[in-house]
Amino acid sequence: MKFVDEVSIRVKAGDGGNGCMSFRREKFIENGGPNGGDGGDGGSIYMVADENLNTLVDYRYTRHFDAERGSNGGSTDCTGKKGEDLELRVPVGTTIIDAGTQEVIGDLTKAGQRLMVVQGGWHGLGNTRFKSSTNRAPRQTTPGKPGEQRDLKLELKVLADVGLLGLPNAGKSTFIRSVSAAKPKVADYPFTTLVPNLGVVSVDRWKSFVIADIPGLIEGASDGAGLGIRFLKHLARTRILLHLVDMAPLDESSPADAAEVIVNELMKFSPSLAERERWLVLNKSDQILEEEREERVKEIVDRLEWTGPVYVISAISKDGTERLSRDIMRYLEDRADRLAADPAYADELAELDQRIEDEARAQLQALDDQRALRRSGVKSVHDIGDDDWDEEDVDDEDGPEIIYVRD
């Protein structure tokens, strides 16, 4: 199934039913009082997190959703039927954003979580409601209120404990195959991975964590080059990042240069994401001589001025992967214990998570704006000079209004 992690939809709640104007008419009762019933409330629309879904592809083809309208009221004080609520199922990890205001309406991070995105219109009142001591036969009713309507943007971020970073062909997919049962495609050419892959890594019998592999980054990714930059948002919810570096590139380029590219692109995309706990994992150690290994490790560590943990592994032969997996599990457990015991630490991480979300969304929005400008024939906003501004347009309120709609 095609992996889709961003869609735009329009949702419209049901209108409320109108109130009824009716009077009681029975045998021997010629002038009975009012008996018009109220209308029914319109149906609302809810987003529901479904653990069985992993893509938003269903919303790529069907984009408009309407809830049922409430029925009109009836005679003999009959209330109209309420419109049926509509549930839209989305994968766990979906963020719902108002496309008009860019306000985050909600974040569905748990299976079964339910969020109302538009509310149905209120019912109209029947003429019975307006009966009084001075008005015995009211002919007044009210119509149902219209239901809310919204344009929404749905963003899916995979939920994983560990995220993998690296250039194409750094061995990320091979690594995830070696430590989990996931079987992502592996080949000897760049960009083999086109969508995020998840794998569950079992440590001992009852312990496990989820690891996410995203398409590789390249130099200039923060400016829109390559595939990986749009998928970096999937690492926003991870607890730890593994920076994989190919120690023996086929083109004999410098591994230190490759490592530096990833660090720079990560900083440009989100400085806060770069603050996340990050471990350096030097892969493909089996392809270089043992006497050269230490020298190459030192070169990479010195170039990056690295002070964090460093692991030298070979994903294909599983050399060093078990130790790395156990250390990750230990770190995740210690982190969870500290979160429960230290409220200040929990607040600090929550604030970091929010900054990462905000920076990632702003960066992707800027890339979308840039793409829209290119489609309109403008390379960038800086290409619009002062000569393109007509001061006469300021007072011309009757002129045409041009609205540019971003795809």
Swiss-Prot record:
Bilayer-crossing residues are: none
Top enzyme class: hydrolase
Task: Look up keyword Hydrolase and say if it applies.
Answer: yes
| The protein's name in its UniProt record | GTPase Obg
Q: Name one GO cellular component term.
A: cytoplasm
Q: Required co-factor? A: Mg(2+)
Q: Where is this region: Disordered?
A: 128-148, 375-407
What does the UniProt entry say about where the protein is found?
Cytoplasm
Q: Where is the composition biased (Acidic residues)?
A: 385-400
The protein's matches in PROSITE patterns, at most eight in alphabetical order, are given as:
G_OBG, GTP1_OBG, OBG
